[in-house]
Amino acid sequence: MKITLASGSPRRAKILEELGVEFDVVKTDAPEASYPHDPERTVRENALAKGAAAAPRTRVLSADTIVWFGGRIYGKPRDLEDAKEFLRELSGKVHTVFTGVAFDGDVKVARSDVKFRRLSDADIEEYVARVRPTDRAGAYDIDESGDLIVESYTGSYENIMGLPTEPLREWGIA
């Protein structure tokens, strides 16, 4: 089954490619909602909005990922200084990654917990030099030099990357 991925995320495209899913990419400019005390609602509504923005196409897959810690939503950082601040705040702590995934109007939410290593300023500088942190929620990518900052995680690795695979299997996509 061929689908439309309503996302410009290279990590989401990589996951679909690894699963052997045939897809086209459509980038959308849907406005993003933010409910700091309700991360599940945030990702659910954003995933649905991105899918709706790709209409009138059918078989549209869309997703939204956030990092949630201390009652705060960490989306994509504005710039490198913002990214470094995110990493400092998450250093040595456990945070939660939420991804809302929508397919043809149905939406599912995945949750994973991630513990960061204690990061020195040098660790943070090395990480941001290796990874472009400004295009990813929470300023990090577990799949790209994640070993520098991630100590452990529970839940779906693919969810932390931005596209949990369990809903894709439920919908018969993968």
Descriptions of predicted regions:
Residues M1-V21:
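N-terminal beta1-alpha1 ligand-phosphate binding loop
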Residues F23-E32:
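A short beta-strand-loop structural module common to alpha/beta enzyme folds
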Residues P10, A30, A102:
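Short, glycine/serine-rich, charged loops/turns that create anion-binding
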